[in-house]
A protein has these predicted regions:
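Catalytic nucleophile-loop/oxyanion-hole region of alpha/beta-hydrolase
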Residues: 105-108, 134-153, 162-165, 335-341
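Conserved alpha/beta-hydrolase "acid-adjacent" motif
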Residues: 306-312
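C-terminal, loop-rich substrate-recognition/catalytic regions characterized by aromatic stacking residues
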Residues: 330, 339-584
């Protein structure tokens, strides 16, 4: 008999579900509760279904669901699509070009993702195109409410609470008679954001989600502590650029969508001039919307993801744990993307979609891939950050243009050190330089044994700028720098952070700096979990413009750092005792 079966709490491949030629593939449109393109009709989402043929004969199965704005094609990286970053902070940038997306993709197949993994194991796989993309109605809003309500409507349809039709307009009703109503969502990057968006609606039937490298707040994606800061690899990208990039929906709706969403709501709300956190960004931060959420959460992220940075998953994981939601996090040491091992995902969906009591909720809630291990072999921990980690406060010792020190002892005499901004030097060049006027570098003693960092490093800095605004960039590095092309991603940069000194009081409000006046600002660097090997030195590098991430103002701004009032706090497993052992 063709039914799902389980070994060791995992759904197994069912021989009769493996034959792709017997899979039933069809598409339809699910009617939502909103009209985001203002055409007077409720938006319908384009949905496709892939299911074993046995579901036509009474077999009901749970659903693995992925939704995306990317399925029907994107704008590509056209010249002039991104904002020009070569201008002073606080200045209006030059206008950028807008690009039209040529829609691709044919009915009935929206995507082939997930199907080979999950259909043979007894799941139905469902895909849908986000509002204003592909053959879905509506407007893309990049984090707006309709991007949460669209997958909610699809889940409602899978539970018999919303209507589906065989045509985009009118048509005959389609019923999900093959669905048990239990749904799990999965996806990477934007496709990982949308499961979280759906979960924040509290929709019944969404039992579990696996967001991989999800963008959980568009402010944290395009800004950093008040600073206009691009996601890694996409210098000059902003929320309106992403809107253009994904807008593959109905051509006749595009002019209206552009005017209302991109050229009004986004341009008025995103504030590329000041970079402050405001109502626009607040409404696109899923941390603020988690109260109704109940779906069991398995998150995955790379500690060296400089596109969607590791804080995106950490902040949601932390809140979900506080809320008592079943939660696990899988962190690896690589860059953007990278799912948990299939065994972890299978156990998660088996428990929450099939209801098999496999005790996954009693597993450790933190899994971290160690530096030399494969992504399939994470190490379990009680929680993240490591419960044995505590913050160790380090003061800056003079000599930063060459190599200053990081020490437990404070300076006895007041000491100021200066750097001159010049974006033409990238961070790696500055970190490797024996001396430079363009950065300040402070090193720990050479480590006599490994140091395990786990959690969030924090910097309090007292700094003055020669101009009314300046970039502030901070890298935590492991030196000597390994310049070998085969060097691992973990070997040089430990973590990074960026801030706008104008936001020293708050993220919501910035004010021009008085040149040469000192301001004190505290901010977090990106979360990390990394073992720094003996023989290395931990270095704090302070500089101004970060060539890969920030605006590129004219070189010459001088930052002066007051060493006595600047403090780096490192989350060290074993705390002060471990630091002393490694450095004395």
């Amino acid at each position: 008999k063709s039914i799902p079966f389980f070994i060791n709490g995992e759904a197994q491949v069912v021989e009769s579900f493996k034959d792709q030629s017997k899979w039933i593939r069809h598409d339809l449109w699910v009617e939502t509760s909103f009209d985001s393109d203002d055409d007077g009709k409720m938006d319908r989402m384009h949905v496709s279904v892939t299911r074993p043929s046995q579901t036509d004969n009474g077999l009901k199965l749970p659903v693995v669901y992925e939704t995306s704005p990317y399925y029907a094609g994107t704008a590509g990286i056209a010249s002039g699509l991104f904002w020009d970053v070569k201008h002073e902070l606080g200045e209006k940038p030059k206008p950028r070009k807008h690009v039209e997306v040529t829609r691709t993709g044919k009915r009935p197949i929206i995507s082939n993702s997930q199907i080979k993994t999950w259909v043979p194991r007894g799941y139905i796989v469902v895909h849908s195109s986000s509002p204003g993309t592909g053959l879905s109605d509506g407007a893309p809003t990049v984090g707006g409410k309709n991007e949460s309500m669209a997958p909610k409507a699809v889940i409602d349809w899978l539970n018999g609470r919303a209507k589906g039709y065989n045509l985009r307009e009118g048509g005959e009703e389609e019923i999900a008679f093959w669905s048990t109503g239990k749904v799990g969502m999965i996806g990477t990057s934007y496709n990982g954001t949308l499961p979280l968006a759906a979960a924040t609606t509290g929709v019944e039937g969404l039992e579990a989600i696996i967001p991989i490298a999800p963008n959980t707040s568009y402010y944290h994606y395009y800004r950093s502590n008040g600073l206009v800061r691009s996601p890694g690899g996409y210098l000059g990208e902003d929320i309106d650029v992403l809107y253009d990039y994904i807008h593959s929906g109905k051509e006749e709706n595009r002019a209206r969508n552009n005017k209302v969403v991109r050229d009004t709501e986004m341009i008025n709300g995103m504030d590329r001039i000041k970079g402050d956190y405001n109502e626009f960004w607040e409404s696109r931060d899923y941390l603020n919307q988690m109260k109704p959420m109940k779906a069991a959460l398995l998150m995955a992220h790379g500690f060296n993801d400089w596109n969607v940075m590791p804080e995106h998953s950490y902040r949601i994981y932390k809140k979900a744990m506080e809320m008592g939601i079943p939660t696990q996090i899988y962190y690896h040491q690589d860059g953007h993307g990278g799912p948990p091992p299939l065994k972890m995902m299978n156990r998660w969906f088996t428990r929450y979609l099939f209801g098999v009591e496999n005790k996954v909720e009693k597993d450790p809630n933190t899994w971290i891939v160690r530096e030399n291990d494969s992504q399939k072999n994470p190490t379990p921990y009680k929680s993240y950050p490591n419960p044995d980690a505590s913050l160790v406060s380090l003061s800056l010792q003079p000599g930063g243009q060459e190599k200053g020190g990081l020490s437990l002892k404070k300076n006895k005499i007041k000491k100021l050190e200066r750097l001159t901004d010049d974006y033409s030097f990238d961070g790696a060049t500055l970190a490797k330089a024996k001396n430079s006027v363009h950065r300040l570098l402070y090193l720990s003693p050479v480590l006599k044994q490994d140091i395990h960092l786990s959690g969030v490093s924090k910097l309090t800095i007292r700094v003055a700028s020669s101009k009314r605004a300046a970039n502030l960039s901070v890298w935590l590095v492991s030196l000597p720098w390994n310049s070998d092309r085969k060097a691992k991603i973990t070997e040089n940069i430990i973590t990074r952070g960026w801030a706008d000194i104008q936001n020293y009081k708050s993220l919501n409000e910035s004010s021009d700096l008085i040149p040469d006046k000192f301001y004190t600002m505290s901010f977090d660097l990106q979360p990390d979990d990394q073992v720094i090997k003996k023989g290395q030195q931990i270095g704090l590098m302070i500089f101004s413009s970060d060539q890969e991430f920030t605006l590129h103002p004219k070189p010459g701004t001088i930052l002066t750092v007051d060493l006595n009032s600047t403090l780096l706090k490192l989350p060290i497993v074993g705390g002060l005792k471990s630091f002393n052992k490694a450095t004395r």
